Amino acid sequence: MEVNGKILSECEAARELKNSGISATFISNWVCLMKSESGLNTSLVKGPGTMSSYSYGVFQINSYKWCKRGRKGGECNAKCEDFADDDITDDIACAKKIQSTEGFKHWTGWLKKCYKNEGALPDVSGCKSNAVKRHALFKRFLNFFAY
């Protein structure tokens, strides 16, 4: 099976989270979680771990409870391998379910590197949305032809 994954930048991760409805207040925590769990690697798969489980994708979603290997299932009703590609919208949906059920404390990487460690939280306030970037490029394009 060929997996198409990528290493996200902090700003790419922040944009994906924002586009998926994550509150701006928590985006730094989510990006820190993603960095601590997977290094922002969307195709990372680790295992076997406890109960022969594997962890998938940028959030390291575990096959023991949240998804099933080779078929849809688990609490997120998802195929684990789908969390190991460059489309993280499904990963975010499942991670939101995990967070709403168990909190950020579910992820040991977040507990060790992000919790009570405000200095470790990435500053993503300077990240521009794609719409803002497109607008800036369009303005430069118009200015080029205005002279």
Where is each model-derived feature located?
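A near-ubiquitous, low-amplitude feature marking generic local secondary-structure context
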Residues: 13-17, 44, 71, 77-78
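Surface-exposed patches in mature extracellular/periplasmic domains of secreted proteins
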Residues: 21-31, 42-47, 104-116
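Generic signature of intrinsically disordered, low-complexity, basic-rich segments
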Residues: 9-10, 24, 46, 132, ...
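Conserved helix-loop-beta core of C-type lectin(-like) domains
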Residues: 28-35, 40-62
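Export/targeting segments at the very N-terminus of extracytoplasmic proteins
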Residues: 1-41
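Catalytic and binding regions of secreted/periplasmic enzymes and modules that target cell-wall glycans
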Residues: 49-147
